[in-house]
Amino acid sequence: MAWSESKAWRRGSSNQPFYQALLDDASTAPARNAKRKKVLHPEDMPWEMSRQGLLKHLINEAMNTRMETVDAYMQIIPPGSRSGKHRHLAEECLYVLEGQGYDLHQDCDVEITDTYHWTPQDEVTRFEWEAGDVIYVPPNTIHQHFNASPDKPVRLISVINRIFKACGLNDLEQLDNAPEYDPAVVLNAEIVDGYLRGRVAAAR
């Protein structure tokens, strides 16, 4: 019916102080932020034996730091090993702290209708890198890192924007696990040192 909206919009009795909540959040932010960390020490940075590999989280939204938009972790790849293989919608850059190796990247064709579909392209591109290099991973690219040395570890710093998650775009998919992955392993400095020297056998 024409102009039916002129009456329909009045329906409903629910009241919620959503705008006031925004004002309250803004007014309390300075005091809240004053308690958040601006400097993190190594003992503040948790380890994780993840499906992607051995990680030491440097900045994460769960770590109560002042960083609002970026997550970062250090990845350790033992001699002769590799990371897991995954893809995500957010672009990523990695700084090579130590070691040398290569990446395998595979672009995907994307179709977005009512649902999201991706199909890997046939071509897989290899990128060589060494300490001091920066690796760029484009959005939605399947990628994996390989340590080319049989006796020296690789350490990478990964940085990724967390805003994409707030936009509903946390499309992270693990396609292959790192050889060392074992959910029963609890990492500490001594255990990680064993991986660095190639003394710990991969789980598979």
Model-derived features with residue positions:
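Short acidic-glycine-tyrosine-enriched beta hairpin
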Residues: 95, 108-139
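A short hydrophobic beta-strand segment most commonly corresponding to one strand
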Residues: 93-95, 136, 144, 151-171
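A short, N-terminal "cap"/entry segment at the start of jelly-roll beta-barrel domains
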Residues: 1-68, 174-177, 184-204
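A structural connector/turn signal
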Residues: 72, 82, 91, 124, ...
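Beta-strand elements of modular eukaryotic interaction domains
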Residues: 64, 84-85, 146-147
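Conserved short histidine dyad/triad with adjacent acidic residue
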Residues: 56-60, 71-88, 104-110, 139-140
